[in-house]
Amino acid sequence: MQAVEIMEEIREKFKEFEKGGFRKKILITDLTPRDGQQCKLATRVRTDDLLPLCEAMDKVGFYAVEVWGGATYDVCLRYLKEDPWERLRRIKEVMPNTKLQMLFRGQNIVGYRPKSDKLVYKFVERAIKNGITVFRVFDALNDNRNIKTAVKAIKELGGEAHAEISYTRSPIHTYQKWIEYALEIAEMGADWLSFKDATGIIMPFETYAIIKGIKEATGGKLPVLLHNHDMSGTAIVNHMMAVLAGVDMLDTVLSPLAFGSSHPATESVVAMLEGTPFDTGIDMKKLDELAEIVKQIRKKYKKYETEYAGVNAKVLIHKIPGGMISNMVAQLIEANALDKIEEALEEVPNVERDLGHPPLLTPSSQIVGVQAVLNVISGERYKVITKEVRDYVEGKYGKPPGPISKELAEKILGPGKEPDFSIRAADLADPNDWDKAYEETKAILGREPTDEEVLLYALFPMQAKDFFVAREKGELHPEPVDELVETTEVKAGVVPGAAPVEFEIVYHGEKFKVKVEGVSAHQEPGKPRKYYIRVDGRLEEVQITPHVEAIPKGGPTPTAVQAEEKGIPKATQPGDATAPMPGRVVRVLVKEGDKVKEGQTVAIVEAMKMENEIHAPISGVVEKVFVKPGDNVTPDDALLRIKHIEEEVSYG
């Protein structure tokens, strides 16, 4: 539909409204406890701080409240040292009257890689048992084969399946493409269709046309909702256009955590529709009470806020979500290459095109972002290819929306070979993943595990094992929530052991907010070292020759220090295998004495939730392995050392 046609159609609708008699209550799902805090506070809000909010939200009358899934499962284990299943049970206790909703990543469940159908069924069963009613099910590639099993399981086990279409903008994503996706979802029997723009780049007239088209194509029998992040600042206008196009429900977030990388404010949307034929029936006074609770939460977790979470209209050009940008910045700081951020951002659309234009949301945003960073810092495109990109091209994530770059496909699959996406991703997953996870969890715990414990391990084995061991020892210590250091005074001759990461300085009567974002790797004594400092929001790189070293709290340096303390030497020899960026060792694939070929994969390192293959820099014999699974490493650490041997050797 053209904009002029849409405007004329809306005029006619308003004439009908003026006659009276038309009423359509718009339903509201509030996402504050999950997506709101994920967008604005890095998902770091602890369960104890969420419970008072959830208890108050139970009295408002939302259609549902999203409290679980997405990154919460991972973050609970990795940073908060909480059992995500216990979180869900505790929330359900204080919200008996409201449907609880979770974000479900299709065949990936809440992880980053496809799992077996058996694992999907097990997870859905336990989620419903522990309190979830509504499942928002999506696949990052819009390969609906990846959500079909989940939708079937949810319906069979008594849940409510909201199947999602993930919006993006590319030459292959046309109006007709969205309608085709919608018809596939209607055919699989979903209870609702969610149209999701996770990046925040859809425009109002397009919103109207697509929502109206979906409603008409599905015969008005399938309820439709809009999930629209606000990165470009147009989401609340999209909400209004969706309402006029016939949408049935809107996703919102309470105002202290709304807008920008998050969603339109619940209060704003409710007020916008109040007194109209679309009145939500929600009491604004109750929303104000909720907002006061959220304000206090935001104050406590202020350290996790970032400038990338605000409105940024540049997203309309580069299509990169705020969270993805902040991840890339963190990677480049730790790799001592922040000066390459613009190159990395420019590389993102190139990688996205090479991979067939996937929408940039989990896990495709991580796959594209990490590869773009590697392409830039290695100095050559696809010189280093992540395991995830290889798996993606081999079809292990599903079928991309468009064709894979021929050059990239041949680099991974071999000359003249093309990707085969005819096989469903789940059929390439380990069919025995549940059984293996059960046995390994039992061995770790030394007893029969619960289904929930097996699921923790099946989805996040390293993090779950760490959690189980720490829980057994009574050593579950969550990541500290440090208060912001407002001012810092350093007396002459006194240098603190750990310098503050955030402070104010006064220079000629003017105040400047300063934040140390990162520090480069250690240099030789007396040599300058790069510090990345943000002054009033502007990032600067400075070189300092320190006489006494002060380590900023929260910077990447402690990881390097940890590596040194564990006896991991710095890479100095041609045969030293290194990681392309800071990360955690997942697997070491060789042992001392093994013969290896140049380019052979010798280890796997996880960085930014993606697995990177570490290759042998030369052919020879593994002389020494310096790391083990669980070790944190930086790019200048030697993971293992290979000794070149002159005589011809045979490789097994």
UniProtKB/Swiss-Prot annotation:
Keyword flag S-adenosyl-L-methionine: no
GO molecular function ontology, one term from the record: 2-oxoglutarate carboxylase activity
Catalytic activity: hydrogencarbonate + 2-oxoglutarate + ATP = (S)-oxalosuccinate + ADP + phosphate + H(+)
PTM note: Biotinylated.
Cofactor: Mg(2+); Mn(2+); Co(2+)
Disulfide bonds: none
CDD domains, A to Z: biotinyl_domain (cd06850), DRE_TIM_PC_TC_5S (cd07937)
Assembly and interaction partners: Heterohexadecamer of 8 large subunits and 8 small subunits.
NCBIfam families, A to Z: PRK09282.1 (NF006761)
Descriptive protein name: 2-oxoglutarate carboxylase large subunit
